[in-house]
Each structure stands twice: as structure tokens, then as C-alpha cells.
Amino acid sequence: MEQFEVKWGIFQGAFPAGQHLQDCFQLTRTNGFAGFELSLETSLPLLPEAYTDSTEGILAIERSVGLDRPRPGGLRFESNMNDLADIKRAAELAGVRIISISTMQLFHYPLSSPIPAIRERAIDIVKKMIDAMVYLGGDLVLVAPGMVTSEVSYQTAWQNARRALQMILPYAAERQIGLGIENIWNKFLLSPLEFVDFIDSFDSPWLGAYFDVANILQYGYPDHWIEDLGNRLKRIHFKDYRQDIGGVAGFTNLLQGDVPWDRVIKALNKINYRGWIVAEVTPYQSAPEQALKDTHSALEAIFSIKELSRSNKSCISNQ
């Protein structure tokens, strides 16, 4: 089978919550990763309209991945140009490229909300990520497309998410920043064909998929999704998931779950994927840096499957 090369990045949540962003950049480089995915956080209280039955659950997830409070030196919704300059300088000094920005804020402020104030905040959040990405030199922001709830029907979620994204897309296109729609546990866009139809309905090269191979295991097969998404795949999250545990507790480190890595790699090769692979893992409670080392080793093992490999030297030089 033909070899192919991809570039490896690491997610901000892979570092302990209290660790300064500058130190995260340094550890990213020293542990062999070329790219870094920032998380947009905030010190602002939630809008009153944002509180729902799922708020406490979302906050619990944020706490579990260290995203429940702003990281020292990190990107915040209220960050100014001086803050962005500090972040950019720290990444450059470490020799790390900031490749994308994600946020948990779109779970509190979904694009699909029927409440105008919530949708407006969601649009502002995505635009904030776009502006930061322009300054920091990356090319993609991760966007949670919305969610279906007991109060928000599937049709309402579809219509509101499309309207919101139609308002954001011209802003992103003008600044040449891609929007990566991620498959999340939102009871929305549950099949690859539906996901493709949603993306294609915008007819824009600036909107595609940010695919998570572990999120999909509850209701699909990652290799099927990768093949169906094809050239719509803008970026991919690697983590693992144990189906025998289930729920949020089922997420685990690479090679310790049920993701069929051989089929994932084969599918990526089939669609000729050459983009970033971002490891979305969490730190160990003790010796947190060891999680970075183990993740790097796991990626080496994954990309040796079926005679597929990539050169770390090439990855680092491909910034």
C-alpha cells in the first residue's frame, strides 16, 4: 500500500488546566508535535438565556478536560490585540504553528438555538475565533453545528444552524478561514449522507467537516464516514473510545479503545488525505507530560499499520 504523510497537532486540553499556554507550546514542540489547536475560553458569566437542563452536564465535561476556566495566557472571548500578540509570540518562540481554534462555548450558545440572543452570541463567538485565527496565522476554526433537544426539534436545529452559518460564511471566506463542522453528540446530523448534504447545501469551499473518529462510534463507523466525506474533510480529531464503558467516561487514550485504526488509516489513504491529524487527548493526573509522549508513540504505531508511515522530521518541517 502506498505510504502517505500527514502532519500531527495536539489539542490544548491535552495539558493540565493551570499550565500556562507558553509552557504548553514548549511541551508541544519538545514532544514532537508541529501544530497546536487553541481553545477559546471566557471569564464572562453565561447569559441568563443560556441556562438549560443540559448546562450542568456541559460544565462537567468542561471541568473534565480543563476547559471550565481560562488558561493562564490563553485565548479568551474578551482577549485584545495585545493578548493575541503574546500568544503569537509564544508560539513562534516555541517553533509551533497554531493551526486551528475550537471552543466549548458553542455548547452553551448553539447556532441552532431558537433564542435570538443565544444565536447572536454564537455568531459572535465564531467570528471572534475567525479574527483570532487570521492574526495567529492558522486556517481553520472548529464549529459545533448546533443540537437537537427536547425544546429544539430536528427541523428547527437544521434551519437555525443553516441561517447562522450563512451569516458567518461570507465573513470567513473574506478572511480565508475555513469552518470545520464537527460530528459531536448533539442528536443532529447523525448519518454521513446527511452530514454531506448539510455541507453541500452551502456550496462553499470554506465550509467542510472536522471529523472525530471516536465521537462517531456510538452511531457509526469512522472509515465509512471518512470515505463519504471525501474531499470535504478539512481536519480530523484522533482519540479513542471504549464502547463497553459508554458515555463520556468511555473516551480514552489512543489504542486503548475500539476505534478500528487499520480501517481509519486505509480510508484516509483512499481519499488521499494530507491534512492535519489533531490528537484530542487529556493529561494524566500524575506525570501529565507522559500523556504527550504516549500519544506520540501511539500515533507512530497507528501510522505504521498496513505499511503506512510518516516521517516526524517531515512533519516538523511542514509547518
Listing of model-derived features with the role each one plays in the protein:
Residues 77-80, 84, 115-119, 123, ...:
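Flexible, glycine- and charge-enriched loops at secondary-structure boundaries
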Residues 36-37, 99-101, 141-142, 236, ...:
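Hydrophobic residues within beta-strands of alpha/beta enzymes
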Residues 4-8, 23, 36, 156, ...:
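Acidic/histidine-rich catalytic cores of soluble enzymes
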Residues 11-15, 39-43, 103-106, 146-148, ...:
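Active-site beta-loop-alpha junctions enriched in small/polar residues
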Residues 135-152, 175-181:
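Active-site groove signature of glycoside hydrolases
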Residues 94-96, 138-139, 177, 271-275:
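A short helix->loop->beta-strand "cap" motif at the edges of active sites that frequently abuts
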Residues 1-135, 166, 173, 204, ...:
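N-terminal pre-domain/capping segments
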Residues 12, 17-19, 24-25, 51, ...:
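Gly/Pro-rich active-site loop or hairpin
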